[in-house]
């Protein structure tokens, strides 16, 4: 096994750890889930570039008669990228004391101001940061509003 194979294994393990944390661990942290709302994806171009470059590496490894283990590892890396960028749906998860947005825990008391833009984007102003929450279904904004009013 070469150094390249070890680096690819490291990347696969890192992506797998992130996927397990996002799917199974994060919803169980900081209390029960009150509401989980699917969000719009930001951009699939980054994922397309990642999977495309990995496909080029797979092709190059096959045509240059590289080791089969490297081909399999690159294929696993491409599948992890496919899952993370296309299959997994980003969510905002509301808990009794706060919420997870982009895998970051934010307590309700940090919210200074909330606005709704014309195009249906919920804007939350924190102390030093502005969150732009783009929900997949516009009716979910009403659920978020009712939850925030009931918990505040």
Curated annotation (Swiss-Prot):
Pfam family, one: DUF986
Transmembrane segments annotated in the record for this chain: 6-26, 45-65, 67-87
Membrane topology category: Multi-pass membrane protein
Record localization: Cell inner membrane
Highest taxon in the source lineage: Bacteria
Keywords, in A-Z order: Cell inner membrane, Cell membrane, Membrane, Transmembrane, Transmembrane helix
InterPro entries: DUF986 (IPR009328)
UniProt key word Ribosomal protein: no
The keyword Ion transport is assigned to this record: no
Principal place of residence: membrane
GO CC field: plasma membrane
Similarity section: Belongs to the UPF0266 family.
Protein name: UPF0266 membrane protein KPK_1957
């Amino acid at each position: 096994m070469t150094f390249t194979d070890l680096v690819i294994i490291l990347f696969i393990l890192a992506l797998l750890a992130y996927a397990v944390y996002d799917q199974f661990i994060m919803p169980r942290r900081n209390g029960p889930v009150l509401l989980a709302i699917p969000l719009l994806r930001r951009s699939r171009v980054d994922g397309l570039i990642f999977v495309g470059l990995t496909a080029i590496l797979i092709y190059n490894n096959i045509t240059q008669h590289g080791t089969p283990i490297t081909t399999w590892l690159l294929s696993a890396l491409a599948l992890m990228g496919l899952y993370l960028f296309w299959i997994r749906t980003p969510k905002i998860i509301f808990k009794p004391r706060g919420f997870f947005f982009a895998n970051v825990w934010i307590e309700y008391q940090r919210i200074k101001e909330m606005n709704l833009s014309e195009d249906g984007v919920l804007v939350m102003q924190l102390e030093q940061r502005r969150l732009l929450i783009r929900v997949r279904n516009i009716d979910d904004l009403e659920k978020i509003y009712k939850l925030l009013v009931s918990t505040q």
